[in-house]
Amino acid sequence: MVDKKANLLWVCSNDFSSAGIPGPSIVPGSYLKGFDLSSGEGKVSAELPGKATLCNDMVVGEDGSLFVTNSLAPQILRLKPGSTQLEIWLENPAFEQPPQGAPGLDGIAFGGDGNLYVDTFAKGDFFRVDVKDGLPGKITKLKPSRPLKLPDGLRSTGGQTFVMVEGGGSVDRVTVNGDDVEITTIKDGIAGPTSVVPVGQTLWVSEGQLPHLFEAAKSGPPHLPFRVIGVPMNK
């Protein structure tokens, strides 16, 4: 995620060795990394606290704090401006993973109302977290117009409208009206989309092909090369 104000590119770096999947290095754990947008130099490396960690999605708040979802614990973490240590901003049983341990909290974005919106990957839930003076308040489980299939990356497009990808293969327009959420599919048939970034009138969607990573014996090798595809926002 690009943070223009801080001049940083924020990314997650995760180790999947606990799931039997070797990573590119021997460094264990899950980290939030910040790189200088101009030089590419690493500026921040913050390890997620705890034993069950999977850095997933992130959003910048009005004060420059970074809010990060942990998919292996019911936690939203916060990195304050100038800090290199993540703290637990909110932990709540509403965000618990399924019993089989599939990923929980995933996409995260602020709405035009100043509140925080998150989705959960395996359970397919969509929540609003009331925010006042930088602190979390009431958590409300919202009502999507149709079931969500592996909701993932979430980004605001202004007001109470968002774009979201579903691991089931679609990128959607998400409109929040009170406790109701209207889901409109913009494009489907995408190979396991994991994230979306709106740039102008184009949505850039990454194809993650996650079944080929986590269910390699069943799904076989991924189809190379991995792609980032452009989707017209108003399609």
Q: For each of these PLM feature ranges, what is it?
A:
Residues 17-20, 32, 74-77, 124-127, ...:
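Structural signal for beta-propeller blades
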